[in-house]
Amino acid sequence: MAGLVPAIHGSLCFGSKDVDARDKRGHDAGERTSAHRRPVWASVYPWLLLLPAAVLLAAFTHYPILATVYATFFVTRRNGPALFVGLDNYRAMFDDPVFWQVLHNNAVFALGTIPTSIALALLMAIWVNRKLRGRGFVRLAYFTPTILPMIAVANIWLFFYTPDYGLLDQLRGLFGLPGHNWLGDQHTVMACLVVMVIWKEAGFFMIFYLAALQQMPPELEEAAAVEGAGQWHFFRRVTFPLLMPTTLFVGINAVINSFKLVDHLVIMTKGGPSNASSLLLYYIYEVAFTFQDRPYAATLTVMLLLILVIAALIKFGYLDRRIHYQ
């Protein structure tokens, strides 16, 4: 009897294992059968969910880009169909002195607004991230210019730049200095626009830096204090390197904004005097809707798109892999 019980137990175990194996094989076979019997719409359903967004993206992004590139190879005639001219519009663009002037203006505008607004945003974020009295009010004051429409910002700054009656000339008058036409002088108009855009954009970029600073573990600063590191050394060696991904994101947004902001030109200067304040996008607007030269405007648009694509490639293809920390 002592040897019979283990034998019976073993046979029962082997029998149960065989049953489990058969059940598993039957279950797998059932899954394969159900997978083969799965209706076609189950595979198509995810694509149907993506279809509305894909249609909108193709209609309002991809098609306009292709249509713009296509239009650059033609010229329109008043009483006839469009005439194919090949690369003539591109040759005319490179021979156009106004194009080179507005491109230079845009470069000066970008170099003036991008680094200054980023540096100011970083300083403001570090300041409002500390424990100080009225911190909420200070944050609101820094961010308020961002929520104002560009048209409103332009009108506010016209109050500063108006000759003789503006705030700047009123302050100059206190020192016996004559009035100055800030927006009518080729040497000062671009600087005036740069200051205004920095005032508007710095608060927007500050939000990203503030969010990044609040995500940094406080143990880093405590460890640096224990080691005797000063605030400047801690910022240069720890804080700023950890903020580089945020700086890259803010930088690419600043580059895009430097080429797409033209609302203030319509209100303040209309590109003058003598195209001294005209930017590339505003020149495209003038060519398309004032001079009614749509093919040449399309050619300028392709050039603007190419500049932004190069900036994006530098960002995603080169800088991303060198400054992100895992």
Identify the meaning behind each predicted range.
Residues 1-13, 19-50, 132-135, 314-326:
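Transmembrane alpha-helical segments of polytopic membrane transport and secretion proteins
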